[in-house]
Regions:
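Outer-envelope beta-barrel architecture signal
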Residues: 4, 20-22, 65-69, 110-116, ...
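Gram-negative (and chloroplast) outer-membrane scaffold detector with strong preference
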Residues: 57-134, 193, 197-205
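Predominantly the C-terminal beta-signal and adjacent terminal strand-loop region
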Residues: 78, 144, 149-205
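Residues that define the transmembrane beta-barrel architecture of outer-membrane proteins
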Residues: 20, 48-52, 75, 92-98, ...
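Short glycine/proline- and aromatic-enriched beta-strand/turn motifs that initiate or cap beta-hairpins
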Residues: 19-65, 69, 200-205
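Flexible, solvent-exposed loop segments that connect beta-strands
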Residues: 33-46, 77-95, 126-146, 181-188, ...
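A structural signal for short, well-ordered beta-strand segments
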Residues: 10, 26, 71, 118-120, ...
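Bacterial Sec-dependent N-terminal signal peptides
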Residues: 1-25, 112, 199-205
Length: 205
C-alpha cells in the first residue's frame, strides 16, 4: 500500500511540472477518537490528543480564475487519550496519505490572500500503538485502524506574499475520517482540528 501511494505521488509530481506553487507544510493535529462501541471504555472519558503533521504539496491553476487544484503527500499523527484513577489508555498512530482538493483565492488585499479550501485525503496507517495501563500493543493491523481511510477536510488559510519568492501561510483545517468497508460493530472515526504553517514557492512555467 505504501508503495502504491509513493508511485501515485511520483506520477503527480511529473504531471505538475508546470505547477504554480510547491509548498512545504507543517502543523499540529488536535485529535478526538469517536468510538462506535464506547461501552468498552465505560468510565474512562476520551480526551483529545495532539500530534504532528508534515506535507509536501503542489498547487495548479485551473481554467477558472482564482480556482486552484492542490495535490499533496503527507504524514499525519492522530493521537488520543482516555482514563481515570483506575485505568489509562493512549493511542499513537501515524498515517501516510495522498491529498487532493480545491483552493479558491477568495480575497486579495495587497500582499495578503484569504483562501478557503476543501478536499479529501486517502490514507493508510504506517505506525500504530495502544498503551493500556502501561502495557503497549501494536494496533497497526487491527481492522479499526488498518486499510484505507477516507478523510474529507474543510478549511481556510491566510497567505502573505514574500516579494517574488512565494508566500508564507497560516491555516486551519477540520476533518473526520471514515472507512466504508468496515463492518465491525466497534470502529473508530477520527475527528481532527489541524493548525498548519506553510512555505510556498513559485515554480516557473
Amino acid at each position: 500500500m505504501k508503495q502504491k501511494l509513493l508511485i501515485l505521488f511520483i506520477f503527480l509530481a511529473f504531471y505538475t511540472v508546470r505547477s504554480q506553487e510547491i509548498s512545504f507544510n507543517v502543523g499540529t493535529n488536535f485529535t478526538q477518537y469517536n468510538l462506535k462501541n464506547p461501552e468498552t471504555y465505560t468510565g474512562t472519558p476520551l480526551q483529545s490528543g495532539s500530534g504532528s503533521f508534515y506535507e509536501i504539496a503542489y498547487l495548479l491553476p485551473s481554467s477558472k480564475e482564482k480556482l486552484m487544484y492542490s495535490f499533496g503527500l503527507g504524514l499525519n499523527e492522530y493521537n488520543a487519550l482516555a482514563g481515570n484513577t483506575a485505568n489509562s489508555y493512549k493511542w499513537n498512530t501515524k498515517y501516510l496519505g495522498i491529498r487532493t482538493g480545491f483552493e479558491y483565492e477568495f480575497i486579495e488585499i495587497q500582499n495578503i490572500k484569504l483562501v478557503p479550501l476543501v478536499g479529501i485525503n486517502l490514507s493508510s496507517i504506517v505506525y500504530g500503538k495502544q498503551e493500556i495501563n502501561g502495557a503497549i500493543y501494536d494496533i497497526s493491523n487491527h481492522s479499526e485502524f488498518s486499510g484505507l481511510k477516507l478523510i474529507p477536510y474543510l478549511g481556510f488559510k491566510t497567505k502573505y506574499k514574500i516579494k517574488d519568492y512565494g508566500y508564507i501561510s497560516l491555516g486551519y483545517n477540520h476533518s473526520v475520517s471514515f472507512k466504508p468497508s468496515l463492518t465491525n460493530k466497534e470502529y473508530v472515526n477520527i475527528s481532527t482540528n489541524q493548525i498548519v504553517f506553510g512555505l510556498h514557492f513559485n515554480v516557473n512555467n
